[in-house]
Amino acid sequence: MTAPDQVARPDGVSAGLPRRDLRQVVATLSAAQITSWGVLYYAFTVLQGPISADTGWSHVAIAAAFSGAQVVNGATGIWVGRHIDDYGPRRVMTIFGLLAVAALGVVATAESFWVFAAGWLLAGAAMAGSLYPPAFAALTHWGGPDRVRALTTLTLVGGLASTVFAPLTTSLDQAMGWRSTYLLLAAVLLLAVTPLHWWGLAKPWTPSARHRQPDPALDVQDGPVPEPDADAPAWDPWTVTRSRPFVLLAFGTSLLTLATYALVVNLIPALVDAGLSPGVAAVALGLGGVGQVAGRLGYARFAAATTPTGRLVMVGTATAAATVALAVAPPVAAVVIGLSVLLGLARGVYTLIQATAVTDRWGTHAYGRLSGVLTAPSLVAGAAAPFVGAALAAVLGGWTGAFLALAGLAAVGTLVVACSSPTRPSARAARSSARS
């Protein structure tokens, strides 16, 4: 059902909400995302050490539980995307937000490691309905022609989650311990985020049609888009997920994600091992976050001047080159900080490239389904990233070899995504073929 002021196209694709309503949705999701990311993700980076010190569980085991959550996140996200396509984000984000509250309750009260790990697996399922992918699906559907601006705003605010919640979590842990901290953060989710999802997302939703013709306004060939034939066959989203371009895009972006986050997670220990002080290493990582914000601020202009595959190749190339430079650069603060900012810039752009990868190639139809499948391998890669980075350093004799190997992964990922552009014959070519 659609409201009178929301245009619904005959093919089941929403033309977007009125701008006032869209601004309300962006504000709702921005507040929910900064809180959900802070509680479900960044709080763990602060509390991992205190948890190990209090319980005696090893850092590796605790990190493995958290990585397991990311794997469950990726697997559950496929179902979440399909549900959002059909019913909208309100119900699923509210229910999964409540699941997050319950999961953190299990984590906070666990007396055995296996109960703790089970709590994180539940939290991983909750992440699938609470973090960026469902929010991206909502704004892609409701944003209409303003969706890139809406997505940019969301990621700018969401990017502040670590800035807000890392020091907050540290203070809470020092005052009351990690268990009470998680219980308090769970209460924040319950009292703040759940109402935002339930009341702030109560907007009309046009269910995605199961099958329809490709969108004639779609940039599927990294260039001018031909009109499809009027009698062109309809397509199914799952046909797209089995296509060569989709598979290559999923594989290539998972390699880029693995390289990017293995570098970020291990940046501070690598810089300290190279001879820099922990303070300088922390500044380098923090200013990389500034670069990330700058990349997101400039994304709309960058996207307007590039093609979908072209910008992904540029970001992948920049990531690989900066990683090589970081591997061989002398441990000079100014040099390291400059490279960290460049890598942050690439990460900021990459987040929005991931958010728009489906719409840039296949349109807004079935965005939730396609995005859920596309991002699942990247989520698994991100979960493995900390272990992959550390393992490479151990096998290759240090962080220089590890960073060069990660640069190689980024380069391979870039080559793969360069071959991922979808194509289809133009209507003119089809008509010429028919006449001949």
PLM-predicted stretches and their roles:
Residues T76-G88, G295-T307, A393:
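Helix-to-loop junctions at the C-terminal end of transmembrane segments
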Residues Q24-H59, G77-V80, A166, L263-I268:
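Extracytoplasmic
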Residues G288, Q292, T306-A357:
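C-terminal transmembrane helical hairpin of 12-TM major facilitator-type secondary transporters
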Residues L154-T206:
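Helix-loop-helix hairpin linking two adjacent transmembrane segments in secondary transporters
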Residues A75-F113:
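Conserved MFS/SLC helix-loop-helix module at the cytosolic interface between two early adjacent transmembrane helices
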Residues F44-Q48, S243-G286, V290-A294:
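Extracytoplasmic gate region of multi-pass secondary transporters
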Residues R361-L396:
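A late C-terminal transmembrane helix in Major Facilitator Superfamily
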Residues G129-G143, V349-W362:
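Intracellular juxtamembrane helix-capping segments at the cytosolic ends
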